[in-house]
A protein has these predicted regions:
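Auxiliary Fe-S-binding modules of radical SAM enzymes
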Residues: 77-158
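Conserved AdoMet/S-adenosylmethionine-binding subsite of the radical SAM
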Residues: 1-110
């Protein structure tokens, strides 16, 4: 039988000016695990140092190709842990009808030691681990934002 493939990416390498550069990979991809760090473009840039436009263009491209996608989102205390932020994420991904899953990942501090050992400054220094008890509420907020936005899009079309 055929080998199934899954691409785990934030999509930042995608070049929206030349989507054909990704044909070789995407033509063989069955599913994408797409990491979205923040729903707000300005906050995304502050958090990651990267403009999210390429990531969103990658999301649009895999939606156009009807490749299944699982959205992965790390919930960081004080940054992405509000109902409002999670609703924004839902609204952001709503146009993508290829979304088959949503993984809300609670931020943890297990990687801090690696950064210290390598002498690399850790951007989230002092941020506590995420309270996992809040995860269902925040996941529901993403789903609610997605549902609201899809209803708006449907009504706009007619």
């Amino acid at each position: 039988g055929r080998v199934h493939t899954c691409l785990d990416s934030c999509g930042y390498a995608f070049d929206p000016q030349h989507p054909e550069k990704f044909d070789a990979v995407l033509n063989e991809t069955d599913m994408v695990l797409l990491d979205i760090k923040h729903a707000d473009p300005v906050e995304h840039k502050k958090l990651t140092g990267c403009d999210p436009a390429r990531i969103l263009a990658f999301g649009d491209e895999i939606a156009r190709r009807k490749i299944k996608v699982v959205i992965r989102h790390v919930v960081v205390p004080g940054i992405t842990d509000t109902v409002e932020e999670c609703e924004k994420l839902g609204r952001l991904i709503a146009p993508w009808h290829n979304v088959v899953g949503l993984e809300m990942l609670p931020y943890h501090t297990m990687g801090v030691v690696k950064y210290e050992q390598l002498g690399i400054p850790y951007k989230l220094e002092g941020v506590p681990q995420m309270d996992t008890a809040r995860m269902p509420e925040l996941r529901n907020a993403v789903m609610a934002g997605m549902k609201k936005r899809r209803a708006e899009l449907k009504n706009a079309i007619g």
